[in-house]
Swiss-Prot record:
Family: Belongs to the peptidase M17 family.
Protein name per UniProt: Neutral leucine aminopeptidase, chloroplastic
Species, as recorded: Solanum lycopersicum
Cofactor(s) listed: Mn(2+)
Function field: Catalyzes the removal of unsubstituted N-terminal amino acids from various peptides. When associated as homohexamer, catalyzes the proteolyzes of Xaa-Leu dipeptides. Possesses leucine aminopeptidase activity against the model substrate leucine-amido methyl coumarin. Presumably involved in the processing and regular turnover of intracellular proteins. Functions as a molecular chaperone to protect proteins from heat-induced damage.
Tissues in which the protein is found: Expressed constitutively at low levels. Expressed in vegetative and reproductive organs, including leaves, stems, roots, cotyledons (after imbibition), pistils, sepals, petals, stamens, and floral buds (at protein level). Present at very low levels in healthy leaves.
PANTHER family on file: CYTOSOL AMINOPEPTIDASE, LEUCINE AMINOPEPTIDASE-RELATED
Intracellular or extracellular location(s): Plastid, Chloroplast
Induction: By wounding.
Keyword match Translocase: no
Keywords: Aminopeptidase, Chaperone, Chloroplast, Hydrolase, Manganese, Metal-binding, Plastid, Protease, Stress response, Transit peptide
GO cellular component, one term: cytoplasm
Recorded consequence of changing residue 351 to L/C/M/G/T/P: Strongly impaired activity but normal homohexamers formation
Length: 569
């Protein structure tokens, strides 16, 4: 199986992407370009997919939004543009005995507006609580409108600054604004490092808040936002680099969102493999790709993976991307493994009944989306000193006469046998292959929409992490604190393995409802070399937003941060 690792050759086809392309100009003032899936080439691709899947799905015509960012130190009163957005905490909104702002910046703005800002914010009941926002059209400033956005507590987090950027983007959409600025009411207590991270989070929020996945809508509004100035957080190469970095990560997050949003009649295992190869060809100075077909997977004895894929008319594709810096010594080798079920019907244990959400099972490749999104971002960032392997065993879990049956005994690529007691516990069968083939690395992180049990335990916005390694747990949690993505470590209770024992094979593939997320992690542990640090991330909850009815791109930002922590950058 080590032969799969570190393959450096690949063949590429002129197969156009149906996903967003990004182009960046120089760091100081760069643009984020979203290429729609409606170009002539994309239409040809959509049509070729439709012939295979009878979807007949075409994408709409839309223009690509471009945002130019600049970091400036100017007087807010003098800034000229459509919307001046000010992020304010509850403390910033404190008033004196005359109901006037005590915050110096708000005082200055209010004075310039002859007291209208304090009066209008009172009428709108704006108190600076997290999630609050109001847009005011007040004469007297260089900006046409002023938007106030609540940050909550004075010790605002990465998430709060990201929400500030998203709120500014939402205000721009509402007002059809083309140029906006974002500032903080107070930067007291913010170190130089915190100012940089705040600028990065604001940029992330603005980019992702502007982006809308309208590929499958017959009509859509064109984004109007063209430029965004970040005021009062510094100028120069350091902040320019941070803003550029945030935009690069956003490119990966948006790819992750689009992959998850794409319906199964469009995003087949073959198309997912083509998207992976597109990443390798775009960043060919640091990436290589190796895509294995079914016959090659058979030669490598990937039985547990191929049995899951056996019922589908869309054949399995095993994806391996390898990132190697173009120069310098490799200090670490790590791997990212993503579950890649482009659709999961549940198989013969079909998903039925309330809450089964079979219509959303296109998101069962959310782990793969995070892994490939991270690959795209890292292709732009190009960290030094670290070799990264990206593994996705892409397939569908369907029902047919050739499909996997309850009671079947299958053999994994490491030789262990598995009695299938539930065909809807298929993700761990495919992940076992991805994990097994990466024993030549020092660290492995796998990501999967693996269990409903994890969603029950942690809710819809927190991913569960499982690892025997305290050091790896600290690394990944530290990365998540920078990215703002929420993780929570859950126990790997070895005594629960008793429920995974089979009378006729080495193990069964599910231990039942109690502790389901834990037993799933214990199953995956069977395929990890003891010398390799390994972590499993169950992102079944946060990969999808029920409120927005859209993918989140969860996992991309944390993976990129973690890879950078393992690099020599």
């Amino acid at each position: 199986m080590n032969g799969v690792l570190c393959s450096s050759s690949s063949s590429f086809h002129s197969y156009p992407s149906i996903f967003t392309k990004f182009q960046s100009s120089p760091i100081w003032s760069f643009s984020i370009s979203v290429t729609p899936l409606c170009s002539r080439r994309a239409k040809r691709m959509a049509h070729s997919i439709a012939r295979d899947t009878l979807g007949l799905t075409h994408t709409n015509q839309s223009d690509a939004p471009k945002i130019s960012f600049a970091a400036k130190e100017i007087d807010l009163v003098e800034w000229k543009g459509d919307i001046l957005t000010v992020g304010a905490t509850e403390k910033d909104l404190a008033r004196d005995g005359n109901s006037k702002f005590q915050n110096p910046l708000l005082q200055k703005l209010d004075s310039k507006l002859s007291g209208l800002l304090s009066e209008a914010s009172s009428e709108e009941d704006f108190s600076g609580k997290a999630g609050q926002s109001t847009i005011l059209r007040l004469p007297g400033l260089g900006s046409k409108r002023i938007a106030l956005v609540g940050l909550g507590s004075p010790t605002s987090s990465t998430a709060a600054y990201r929400c500030l950027g998203e709120a500014a983007a939402a205000a721009a959409k509402s007002a059809q604004a083309s140029n906006i600025a974002i500032a903080l009411a107070s930067t007291d207590g913010l170190s130089a490092e915190l100012k940089l991270s705040s600028a990065s989070a604001i940029t992330t929020g603005a980019v992702l808040g502007t982006f809308e996945d309208n590929r499958f809508k017959s009509e859509s509004k064109k984004p109007t936002l063209k430029s965004l100035d970040i005021l009062g957080l510094g100028t120069g190469p350091e902040i320019e680099k941070k803003i550029k970095y945030a935009a690069d990560v956003c490119a990966g997050v948006i790819l992750g969102r689009e992959l998850v949003n794409a319906p199964a009649n469009v995003l087949t295992p073959a198309v997912l493999a083509e998207e992976a190869k597109k990443i390798a060809s775009t960043y060919s100075d640091v990436f290589s790709a190796n895509i294995l077909d079914v016959e090659q997977c058979k030669e490598l004895k990937m039985g547990s993976y191929l049995r899951v894929a056996a019922a589908s008319a869309n054949p399995a594709h095993f994806i391996h991307l390898c990132y190697k810096p173009s120069s310098g010594e490799i200090k670490k080798k790590i791997a990212l493994v993503g579950k890649g079920l482009t659709f999961d019907s549940g198989g013969y244990n079909i998903k039925t009944g309330p809450g089964c959400s079979i219509e959303l099972m296109k998101f069962d490749m959310g782990g793969a989306a995070a892994v490939l999104g991270a690959a795209k971002a890292l292709g732009q960032i190009k960290p030094a000193g670290v070799e990264v392997h990206f593994i996705v065993a892409a397939c569908e879990n369907m029902i047919s006469g050739t499909g996997m049956r309850p009671g079947d005994i299958i053999t994994a690529s490491n030789g262990k046998t598995i009695e299938v007691n539930n065909t809807d516990a298929e993700g761990r069968l495919t992940l076992s292959v991805g994990i097994s083939c990466n024993q030549g690395v020092e660290k492995i992180v796998d990501l999967a929409t693996l269990t409903g049990a994890c969603v029950v335990a942690l809710g819809p916005s927190i991913a569960g992490i499982f690892t025997p390694s305290d050091d790896l747990a600290k690394e990944v949690v530290a990365a998540s604190e920078v990215s703002g993505e929420k993780l929570w470590r859950l126990p790997m209770e070895d005594s629960y393995w008793d429920s995974m024992k089979s009378g006729v094979a080495d193990m069964v593939n599910t231990g039942g409802r109690p502790g389901g997320a834990i037993t799933a992690a214990l199953f995956l542990k069977q395929f990890v070399n003891e010398k390799v640090q390994w972590m499993h991330i169950d992102l079944a909850g946060p990969v999808w937003s029920d409120k927005k009815k859209n993918a989140t791109g969860f996992g991309v930002s944390t993976l990129v941060e973690w890879v950078l922590k393992n690099s020599t950058n």
